[in-house]
Amino acid sequence: LDLSRDEVCEYVINAVSNILANANIEYVKWDMNRQLTDMPRLGYNHEYTLGYYKIMSAITEKFPNILFEGCSSGGGRFDAGVLAYMPQIWTSDNSDAIARLKMQYSTSMCYPVYSISSHVTASPNHQCGRDTSLRTRADVAYCGTFGYELDVTKMSDEEFEEIKAQIKFEKRIQDLMCNGDLYRLINPYETNY
């Protein structure tokens, strides 16, 4: 959709608002890929982004109790302006904990930790096949918004108990992780651990 056009923005605002007003929705992941090449005119990227902000401003004002999460994958949407409408952004579709170390390290150079969506996902990872312990996956996820994206019905009783302990621990450290000072002690680009 050409979000540089007012009539397109109004259409999106109305269509999305209609859905949100008529359903019990508390969370929306706005996974929006955009064309980054072959722009039709000079200034199109800027106009498109302003249209996107217009849409998000209208929708988030109408629905202040819905958590909107942005998504950077494929669309370059992890920008400072988006944080005015979406307090957290999915950093990458690559959810492998080890790969996320570098991504989250780099992202935290420009964005607050509490805006970096980071979840414990299934192992072995569906993108790279790496098998990573539940503890390691949680340790990485603590350094972001922290959540789970896996099928707990496929977990052992022991793993389920570990998840409950991880959630309890995260609740204890949440304020520190979101509002504390961040010191980068090791650069993952300069070491293998």
Write out the residue ranges for each language-model feature.
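Active-site-proximal beta-alpha loop/turn segments in soluble metabolic enzymes
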Residues: 1-2, 36-44
